[in-house]
A protein has these predicted regions:
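Beta-propeller domain segments
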Residues: 1-217, 222, 251
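Blade-level signature of beta-propeller repeat domains, shared across WD40, Kelch, NHL, RCC1
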Residues: 225-252
């Protein structure tokens, strides 16, 4: 099954300009469809961004467009997803059915592809977390960059937001470049939040040998890492596995 992004107005009614209002049998509240698990949404400069957790292969960041079909369950990332859940190259005729209901289709459409993706492999992760465009002043190098996380591994990355918008060009191979955020904590520099969270988990009374939760890439539990900002646009890192909210301060 796939997920959709819905649109209603302030009175919980369906806007007249929703894309499927006039499509017979369609759910009129749907704004965009074909995402597996778009569990994190954020707005930036009038653009809606959805971080969607993948099945076995790709985690994705998507620019949500009116009426767009992001392909799931026939696409994952910029590849074709087969019925046995194996990934293959895209077909030359890259079109998929428009599924109006479980049994009714209405023609075909070219899928819309992500602007960022990363694999379920070391250096990537298991589940894309929160993301936001940083507007604060504490970290100039991140200003106007899209900062996002992987939940389980504790990776924090950024991408140039303008590059993300440019990557939404209809070419499935066009992706914005991901850059790793290094974390300085107590005099040491880390590639991910995972060792920081693991240390705090035990210091705060955690009883397990490893962090709780299942994570296939790390094999060692979940850091459960997310980002947020305050009213001034400054960045915070939230890690549920150790129950800590950390303020990101100016580099020293």
């Amino acid at each position: 099954q796939s997920s959709s992004v819905l649109s209603d107005n302030g009175r919980y009614r369906i806007p007249n300009d929703n894309p499927f209002v006039s499509t017979a049998g369609a759910r009129k509240e749907v704004w965009a469809l074909g995402l597996r698990n778009p569990h994190r949404l954020t707005w930036a400069d009038g653009h809606l961004i959805a971080n969607s957790i993948g099945l076995h292969t790709w985690e994705t960041v998507n620019i949500i467009q009116k009426g767009a079909n992001y392909g799931y369950s026939l696409r994952e990332g910029n590849e074709a997803l087969q019925f046995d859940n194996h990934i293959t190259a895209l077909p030359e005729a890259d079109r998929i059915p428009v599924q109006v209901t479980d049994t009714v289709t209405a023609g075909t459409v070219v899928p819309t592809y992500p602007v960022i993706q990363y694999p379920h492999k070391p250096g990537g992760g298991d589940a894309v977390g929160t993301g936001l465009v940083y507007r604060g002043s504490m970290i100039p190098a991140l200003r106007d960059k899209y900062v996002f996380t992987d939940i389980s591994t504790g990776h924090i990355w950024y991408a140039d937001f303008k590059e993300m918008l440019a990557a939404d060009d209809g070419n499935p191979r066009t992706m914005a470049t991901m850059h790793e955020v290094k974390i300085r904590w107590k005099g040491q520099v880390y590639d991910t939040m995972f060792p920081i969270v693991e240390s705090a988990y035990h210091a705060r009374g955690g009883k397990r040998a490893r962090l709780p939760g299942l994570a296939l890439v790390s094999g060692e539990g979940r850091a459960d890492t997310h980002v947020a900002t305050d009213a001034s646009g400054e960045l915070y890192v939230l890690t549920k596995s150790d129950g800590v909210i950390r303020v990101v301060s100016r580099p020293r």
